[in-house]
């Protein structure tokens, strides 16, 4: 036999064993089409699927489950309301057969009973397309584990099953459960609502408690995965112990509860999420009360979010704030009154004692127990009740379509389960202002609500404080919550406080929520969107202060005209330019005089012209550097200055040669004069300087560069030569050598005739240049920044002034104030006197 035949044989055997005469029950309403109902009217403390036992458990031996009876009444109310409606199923009587599954203890026997014929036989067939079961659809049961058990049977027959509160995401697998639908959002939405609640209140340090069954494990795992994506950490997760049926808690289980509550006390987390059936929580909360663990926020899963019996433990109000995730409340007119006057479940009528029936269809204490909670049930509103109510109406609308009903009649005919299933998938109707239809996963998109537990008898015990919409996956309409804290402040549940702006996180331990906050150093910033654990360096042209989230442009610093040092240097340069120009005019007017000729004659005009050009180069030091200004700084000015110094050095050498070396080396002196020695020397020096300048420009380039001021990193110094310090000695080496040579020859000519003795003036100029250059190098080794540029420019101008005024100034003074000394006769007399002294 195939797998299908083997499965059917197993079902037949189980049905033969379990279908014995059962206890009396009247959870039955005859009709043309019967609905099966599976509800937990009783519950044990730890459900066991009794596949290994030959005897069906007696549910009445367990405690009454008020919510289960309330949901059963919702099914009965919906069926009676439909039967009284002349338009939905006119002429058709809808009936029901309800069985108590006592949570997860009794699922197999009822489903076999629903699948069997009236004679309690389930025949083995190759094709069940034309098979007629006892019921056309099943409503329930209430939890995911039971739903899977039932669905595995019903799916073989494609008998429609609509669950009203099972949320497991596994139930969306339509390959495994093709006949299963539900009128409640999936666990994915329940967990998402919890996570968005935590995000809204910035709780990222959470405790998770789960039950030891499939419900707790699966939802705890789903929550953990979802929290990890949102950087919410689980401080610890524990499994709550539960009791065996009709057994007291063992010492090991009690010690386990004590240990869990001890961990709650020691943890810094103050938000506790509990995924567990209500049955597992009574002993747990009693232990919490005993240890007086207070100040926490308890987030309840839908299994106990609106449980009236657990809410009846009024001492829970002292433990903290209780929030729950549950389905929306939809008022059902007339239901509260129906629940209150429903007759007590009694023995079955005599007309049915000869027919087939099943066990677990009685609940002697259900009505009394429910009435004792009637106030809280009435104030809390119809939540899961509406899910049952809409499930029954979904079947009724499918029958309406399948039977071809109009406003007055329906065509009664045989309804096969697979036919009804197809129509249920198609239903789309409005029920109490809510649209009911099934999405591709078989779910109805009713929105969820966040409820807060209240113990004020005048208020709703489960007050809605927010709504979650599955289609938008958004938490909205968040209202004020009454926190059990001082001044009603929002509780804080964070492993580490949020870092301030511009602080990076340094992980502490294994949890991403536990960290130290460290300020980002200057020059770095924190980009929260990319990396919260590392500060990023600012770009080269930007800077930041400590603890910044962005960088700002560095201030570009260069010499500007409005600055006082620049103005002072510019005035000196203007003074030098004007004085040099005046000297040039004076020398031009007295070109043929002995003083001008002794100073060098045409060579003086070359020097003065180059000095004027050098003064005109001074303005290029001011303002942002460009390629053209850098060319002037690095090429034009050094050439001008070097030629001036070379003229002085050559002139000093020429005078010494004329008076001291001509007689000793007449031949050499004649070559010097004949082949224009001074000009050849100056040309050689000029070419050598040009080579030095070109090498320097090739090494450093002409493009302006930027560098950070080491004393003030927010400042960027714009300069022409990035390696100015290193190249300064190389660029000035020739000038320093010429100054030493000029000084030496001037010193050698200190005994020459007064009119030719320029030792004092050349010594002044050359000594000043040498000293200033050495001082500039020393200054640059100690300081940096734009101050170096200012000092460099100042030294340059002073060196030019030293030549203009120190070398040419005394000669102008003699020309203007002692004209009698500017005659050939005077010069000849001075030469004769020098000659006589030597003799």
From Swiss-Prot:
Gene Ontology terms: biological process: sensory perception of taste
UniProt superkingdom: Eukaryota
Extracellular side: 20-566, 624-635, 703-727, 782-784
Subcellular location: Cell membrane
UniProt topological domain (Cytoplasmic) ranges: 588-602, 657-681, 749-760, 806-839
A single GO cellular-component term on record: plasma membrane
Glycosylation sites: 84, 248, 292, 312, 368, 407, 428, 487, 527
Primary location recorded for the protein, binned into one broad class: membrane
Keyword annotations: Cell membrane, G-protein coupled receptor, Glycoprotein, Membrane, Receptor, Sensory transduction, Signal, Taste, Transducer, Transmembrane, Transmembrane helix
InterPro entries linked to this entry: ANF_lig-bd_rcpt, GPCR_3, GPCR_3_9-Cys_dom, GPCR_3_9-Cys_sf, GPCR_3_C, GPCR_3_Ca_sens_rcpt-rel, GPCR_3_CS, Peripla_BP_I
SUPFAM superfamilies from the UniProt entry: Periplasmic binding protein-like I
An MF annotation (GO) of this entry: 1-pyrroline-5-carboxylate dehydrogenase activity
Membrane association type: Multi-pass membrane protein
Keyword Repressor: no
Transmembrane segments: 567-587, 603-623, 636-656, 682-702, 728-748, 761-781, 785-805
Signal peptide feature range: 1-19
Family: Belongs to the G-protein coupled receptor 3 family. TAS1R subfamily.
Role summary: Putative taste receptor. TAS1R2/TAS1R3 recognizes diverse natural and synthetic sweeteners.
Subunit architecture: Forms heterodimers with TAS1R3.
Name this protein carries in UniProt: Taste receptor type 1 member 2
Organism field: Gorilla gorilla gorilla (Western lowland gorilla)
Gene: TAS1R2
């Amino acid at each position: 036999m195939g797998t299908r035949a083997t499965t059917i044989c197993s079902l037949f055997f189980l049905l033969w064993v379990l279908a014995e005469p059962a206890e009396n029950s009247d959870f039955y309403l005859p009709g043309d089409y019967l609905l099966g109902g599976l509800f937990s009217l009783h519950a044990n403390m730890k459900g066991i699927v009794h596949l290994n036992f030959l005897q069906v458990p007696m549910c009445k031996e367990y405690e009454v489950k008020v919510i289960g009876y309330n949901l059963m009444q919702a099914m009965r109310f919906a069926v009676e309301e439909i039967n009284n409606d002349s338009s939905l199923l006119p002429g058709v009587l809808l009936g029901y057969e309800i069985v108590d599954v006592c949570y997860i203890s009794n699922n197999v026997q009822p489903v076999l009973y629903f699948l069997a014929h009236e004679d309690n036989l389930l025949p083995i067939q190759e094709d069940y397309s034309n098979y007629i079961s006892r019921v056309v659809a099943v409503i329930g049961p209430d939890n995911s584990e039971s739903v899977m058990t039932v669905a595995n049977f019903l799916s073989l027959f494609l008998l429609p099953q609509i669950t009203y509160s099972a949320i497991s995401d596994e139930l969306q697998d339509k390959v495994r459960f093709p006949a299963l639908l539900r009128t409640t959002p999936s666990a994915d939405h329940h967990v998402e609502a919890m996570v968005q609640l935590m995000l809204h209140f910035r709780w990222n340090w959470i405790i998770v408690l789960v039950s030891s069954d499939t419900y707790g494990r699966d939802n705890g795992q789903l929550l953990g995965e979802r929290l990890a994506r949102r950087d919410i950490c689980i401080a610890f997760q524990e499994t709550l112990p539960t009791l065996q049926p009709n057994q007291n808690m063992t010492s090991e289980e009690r010690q386990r509860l004590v240990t869990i509550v001890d961990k709650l006390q020691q943890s810094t987390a103050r938000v506790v999420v509990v995924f567990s059936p209500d049955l597992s929580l009574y002993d747990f909360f009693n232990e919490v009360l005993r240890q007086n663990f207070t100040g926490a926020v308890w987030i309840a899963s839908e299994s106990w979010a609106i449980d009236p019996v657990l809410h009846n433990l009024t001492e829970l109000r002292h433990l903290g704030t209780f929030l729950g995730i549950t389905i929306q409340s939809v008022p059902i007119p007339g239901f509260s009154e129906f629940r209150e006057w429903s007759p007590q479940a009694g023995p079955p009528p005599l007309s049915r004692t000869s027919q087939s029936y099943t066990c677990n269809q009685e609940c002697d204490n259900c009505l009394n127990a429910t009435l004792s909670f009637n106030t809280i049930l009435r104030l809390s509103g119809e939540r899961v009740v509406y899910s049952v109510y809409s499930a029954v109406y979904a079947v009724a609308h499918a029958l309406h379509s399948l039977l071809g009903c109009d406003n007055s009649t329906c065509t009664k005919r045989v309804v096969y389960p697979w036919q009804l299933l197809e129509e249920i998938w198609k239903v789309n109707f409005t029920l109490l202002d809510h649209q009911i239809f099934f999405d591709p996963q078989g779910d109805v998109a009713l929105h969820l609500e966040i409820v807060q537990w209240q113990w004020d008898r005048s208020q709703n015990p489960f007050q809605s404080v927010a709504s979650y919409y599955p289609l938008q996956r958004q938490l909205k309409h968040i209202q004020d919550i009454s926190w059990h804290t001082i001044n009603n402040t929002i509780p804080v549940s964070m492993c580490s406080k949020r870092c301030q702006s511009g602080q990076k996180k340094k992980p502490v331990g294994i949890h991403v929520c536990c960290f130290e906050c460290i300020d980002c150093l200057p020059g770095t910033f924190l980009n929260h969107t990319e990396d919260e654990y590392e500060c990023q360096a600012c770009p080269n042209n930007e800077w930041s202060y400590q603890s910044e989230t962005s960088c700002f442009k560095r201030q570009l610093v260069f010499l500007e005209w409005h600055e006082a040092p620049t103005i002072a240097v510019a005035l000196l340069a203007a003074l030098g330019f004007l004085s040099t120009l005046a000297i040039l005019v004076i020398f031009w007017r007295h070109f043929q005089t002995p003083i001008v000729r002794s100073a060098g004659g045409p060579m003086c005009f070359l020097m003065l012209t180059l000095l004027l050009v050098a003064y005109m180069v001074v303005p290029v030091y001011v303002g942002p550097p460009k390629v053209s200004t850098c060319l002037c700084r690095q090429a034009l000015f050094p050439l001008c200055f070097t030629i001036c110094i070379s003229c002085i050095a050559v002139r000093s050498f020429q005078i010494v040669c004329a008076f001291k070396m001509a007689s000793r080396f007449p031949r050499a002196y004649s070559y010097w004069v004949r082949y224009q020695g001074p000009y050849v020397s100056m040309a050689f020096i000029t070419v050598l300087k040009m080579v030095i300048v070109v090498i320097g420009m090739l090494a450093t380039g002409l493009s302006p560069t930027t560098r950070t001021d080491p004393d003030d990193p927010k400042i960027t110094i714009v300069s022409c030569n990035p390696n100015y310090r290193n190249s300064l000695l190389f660029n000035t080496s020739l000038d320093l050598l010429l100054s030493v040579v000029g000084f030496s020859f001037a010193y050698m000519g200190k005994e020459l005739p007064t009119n030719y003795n320029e030792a004092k003036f050349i010594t002044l100029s050359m000594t000043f240049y040498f000293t200033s250059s050495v001082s500039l190098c020393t200054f640059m080794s100690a300081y940096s920044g734009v101050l170096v540029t200012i000092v460099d420019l100042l030294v340059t101008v002073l060196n030019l002034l030293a030549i203009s005024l120190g070398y040419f100034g005394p000669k102008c003074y003699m020309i203007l104030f002692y004209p009698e000394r500017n005659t050939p006769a005077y010069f000849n007399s001075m030469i004769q006197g020098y000659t006589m002294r030597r003799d």
